[in-house]
Amino acid sequence: MSKNYHIAVLPGDGIGPEVMTQALKVLDAVRNRFAMRITTSHYDVGGAAIDNHGQPLPPATVEGCEQADAVLFGSVGGPKWEHLPPDQQPERGALLPLRKHFKLFSNLRPAKLYQGLEAFCPLRADIAANGFDILCVRELTGGIYFGQPKGREGSGQYEKAFDTEVYHRFEIERIARIAFESARKRRHKVTSIDKANVLQSSILWREIVNEIATEYPDVELAHMYIDNATMQLIKDPSQFDVLLCSNLFGDILSDECAMITGSMGMLPSASLNEQGFGLYEPAGGSAPDIAGKNIANPIAQILSLALLLRYSLDADDAACAIERAINRALEEGIRTGDLARGAAAVSTDEMGDIIARYVAEGV
């Protein structure tokens, strides 16, 4: 693999810098094992950028991201900056503008129950025993969150509020292709979530998804209403491979998927644009209460690196190597404190060292 790649690294706040350090250890192992030419540059973002530059997303950070093939993002936010106006706080002032600037229209959230962690799953033991490995593909830029008109008007008993669910054909086509392409790298099944028995936007959604499905004859397509999907995720999550969702439905289902895994410290996330450029981050927050204690679980950050390799650098072999290394560590009972349940726990640094070593060894 001879191409040169460049990654913008944005560690951020709280546990972000310490878990990012572990992801970069793993990246070193990937570089060496797969002879990949990958360089990195670090930039301030979030609260760290406010402290150092007076704003959560400095121009130099945006420029650095523009020059990169992908962004590896840590986490932002914390009580130190909560007194600031909302649009100047780390989350709203950094992450949302980055998504908008790079036109990141799709969000990918894997949710997997790892062998040995079934006890953390809040579902019944017989359901958890079947395991699950789901990818929730959510459209990020359309739908009811952004549709117009929206607002409030009137007064007294006639006061009202309104939002508008709007989807264009091109928005549905491109998110559907992301889901089908992802399914080709997984178990070849897409379940599209809608409310086509009631909503016009969902009727269009279903029609277009059916059209796109003809381009992917090797991928099985099923449709499911959102209300049934929320129940089926509790009843038997193992039936799902890729979930294809609108903005609102994906917002709901991706969090439900996260909850049934039992540990936010294990969940990565990817946001992509049409050119394959992506921002990759853990699904959890900055956890300022445990920052600097060397006890945070770095696996979500390391898995975010795996997604980056798979989707932005087209290095699926390297991504799989990371995932296998994590599987082995967990199967051997290696746990950070959030997963230890009274047993011996390893530190953040130790978990990073172990996973990097397993990647290097090619387990």
UniProtKB/Swiss-Prot annotation:
Regulation of protein activity: Requires K(+) ions for optimum activity.
Cofactor binding mode and count: Binds 1 Mg(2+) or Mn(2+) ion per subunit.
Listed transmembrane segments: none
UniProt keyword annotations, A-Z: Amino-acid biosynthesis, Branched-chain amino acid biosynthesis, Cytoplasm, Leucine biosynthesis, Magnesium, Manganese, Metal-binding, NAD, Oxidoreductase
Protein name per its UniProtKB record: 3-isopropylmalate dehydrogenase
Gene: leuB
Xref: InterPro entries: IsoCit/isopropylmalate_DH_CS, IsoPropMal-DH-like_dom, Isopropylmalate_DH
Cofactor(s) this protein cannot do without: Mg(2+); Mn(2+)
pH dependence comment: Optimum pH is 7.6.
Pfam annotation, one family: Iso_dh
Enzyme Commission numbers on file: 1.1.1.85
Family label: Belongs to the isocitrate and isopropylmalate dehydrogenases family. LeuB type 1 subfamily.
Task performed by this protein: Catalyzes the oxidation of 3-carboxy-2-hydroxy-4-methylpentanoate (3-isopropylmalate) to 3-carboxy-4-methyl-2-oxopentanoate. The product decarboxylates to 4-methyl-2 oxopentanoate.
Broad class of enzyme this protein falls into: oxidoreductase
Binding site for Mg(2+): D227, D251, D255
Pathway(s) per entry: Amino-acid biosynthesis; L-leucine biosynthesis; L-leucine from 3-methyl-2-oxobutanoate: step 3/4
Thermal activity profile: Optimum temperature is 70 degrees Celsius.
Binding site for substrate: R99, R109, R138, D227
Record organism: Escherichia coli (strain K12)
One GO BP annotation of this record: L-leucine biosynthetic process
Major location category of this protein: cytoplasm
Residues the record lists as binding NAD(+): 78-91, 285-297
Gene3D superfamilies, A to Z: Isopropylmalate Dehydrogenase
Annotated site residues (Important for catalysis) in this chain: Y145, K195
Catalytic activity: (2R,3S)-3-isopropylmalate + NAD(+) = 4-methyl-2-oxopentanoate + CO2 + NADH
Compartmental location: Cytoplasm
